């Protein structure tokens, strides 16, 4: 039986990976045409700082980067280069740097930014959802639902702006500088990031015992993480609460209570396991929401990760950077959904693919 189940799972994974490849291809095609139909002229944006540039130079530059060609010809050239590992070179946001090199440089800061929310949000949201369901219609439930409403109603860019203003203009002033959070960028100007072994500041700080870099990096990550946690906490907490309320009405939960099982064991061993099945999909979807939310948090806190560069590339018309970043985000999101489906079988062995 186990061999049959393992074989079915393997076949399912192979099928899902093939579907992912097809979906990524369609994302690539759609992204190319949508970005190239944008009314943004990258050459004009780059040369607008110097109005004395002759028109002939402008035309030569358009020809050099290939934007003068018909869109379908550009598409064939890009696809050929893409599958050969050449994703193009940035023209605006990192002049001349290969897109793959740029992504390798800005991927670690974004992962560090979303790492704390990814770890804390599932733990906090499940705990809050259980507490809210357990104390339904009591003051504990009212407080938790109030926090949920805050996360649902307040956009992340607005909340991030409020947090930044509070930390820089109120908290710092009224504590006379004793409490001083860094409210922009990934590191302070006076902190040297020399030992770039992994590209992850926190990991490199641990490896090289750089206490100054570690403390500074954590201070810069803290405020954007708080904004992400408050906003993303809401959906998973709400889903956990609803699932727990449904499960706690089931006969097997009532039977466990009738047998004298402790309430703690009823919640953790009987109810929670089944309530986590729909919630696990929300938790995996958290990765997608955090990546999308990083576009706003990185812009507000001037944190130069994937979101910051994506926004800058859209503004400047740096097409190859836009496409490269969206493809990477798509791969992460699709991989996350695959992991969620596999986790279903771990949470509930009755699910067979």
Describe these PLM feature segments.
Residues 8, 12, 32, 36, ...:
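Transmembrane-helix boundary motif in ABC transporter permease subunits
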Residues 10, 107-108, 112, 116-140, ...:
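Alpha-helical transmembrane segments of integral membrane proteins
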Residues 2-9, 67-126:
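An internal, D/E-rich "acidic patch" concept
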Residues 24-76, 167-213:
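Hydrophobic alpha-helical transmembrane segments of membrane transport/permease proteins
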Residues 38, 151-154, 291:
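Transmembrane helix irregularities
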Residues 1-18, 258:
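N-terminal Sec/SRP start-transfer signal
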Residues 17, 57, 61, 71-87, ...:
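Hydrophobic alpha-helical segments of integral membrane proteins
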